[in-house]
C-alpha cells in the first residue's frame, strides 16, 4: 500500500510539472507575432525569480550545517573536553557520571570528598 501511495504521489508531481510547462505553438502567424511573444519573456527573465530566494537560503543553511558538523568534536576527545568544561565545583569527576547518578554506586551526598 505504501508503494502505491508513493507511486501515485510521484505521478501527480510529474503531471503537475508537465502541465506547468508552456506549450509551444504549432503554427506561428509570422515574425511579428513571434517578436511580440518574446518581449514579455525577456522581461520575465530579467526579473529575479522568487523561487530562487528560498533555494539560496536553504543552500546557505545547509552549508552552515555541514561546516558545523565537520567542526563538531567526536569520539573520546569530545568526552574529555566535556569533562573539562564542567563547573570546578562539580564534585564528581568520574567520566561515567557526567551529571547522572548510577543507583549501584554510592551517592555523592553520602561520600565526603577530600578535595
Swiss-Prot record:
This protein's name: Cholecystokinin
Species annotation: Bos taurus
Oligomer status and interactors: Binds to CCK-A receptors in the pancreas and CCK-B receptors in the brain.
Cell compartment(s), UniProt: Secreted
PROSITE patterns listed in its UniProt record: GASTRIN
PTM notes: The precursor is cleaved by proteases to produce a number of active cholecystokinins.
Gene symbol of the encoding locus: CCK
Modification sites for Phenylalanine amide: 103
Region (Disordered) location: 21-44
PANTHER family linked: CHOLECYSTOKININ
Function: This peptide hormone induces gall bladder contraction and the release of pancreatic enzymes in the gut. Its function in the brain is not clear. Binding to CCK-A receptors stimulates amylase release from the pancreas, binding to CCK-B receptors stimulates gastric acid secretion.
Signal peptide: 1-20
Family, as annotated: Belongs to the gastrin/cholecystokinin family.
Keyword flag Iron: no
Keywords, comma-separated and alphabetical: Amidation, Cleavage on pair of basic residues, Hormone, Secreted, Signal, Sulfation
